């Protein structure tokens, strides 16, 4: 809730907002889309993807002292993976018919991040 409150405050002031979060459920995406629609801003979803073994290897190298994430353990990753709901742009558009939406999928399997690339894009 605090994340959405802060985004609302920025948007209210005419600024842009990036909500950096693991939106694994469509209901969270709906909340963010509603904010963008309220302030007539384009809503961009940046979804990252890479092979499971790459993700788990990265998680294994993380430590609580050096990294802020909700996926600090293999189990946390697996839990998020199980709960993940496919991004449904049609649903977001039905709820916010005047909202411009872009969904980007970024392949993050390679290191360093400069080697990441957009592997998919859909606009509504």
Tell what function each PLM region has:
Residues 23-25, 49-55, 110-113:
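Conserved nucleotide-binding/hydrolysis micro-motifs of P-loop NTPases
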Residues 31-35, 59-62, 120:
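Short, glycine/charged-enriched secondary-structure capping and boundary segments
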Residues 57, 82-124:
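NTP-dependent small-molecule kinase module
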Residues 19-20, 46-49, 104-107:
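Conserved beta-strand segments of the P-loop GTPase G domain that flank and frequently precede/overlap
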Residues 38-87:
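A glycine- and Lys/Arg-enriched "phosphate-lid" helix/loop adjacent to the NTP-binding pocket
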Residues 1-44:
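Glycine-rich phosphate-binding loop used to anchor ATP phosphates in small-molecule kinases
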Residues 7, 14, 66, 88-91:
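A general structural signal marking secondary-structure boundaries and capping sites
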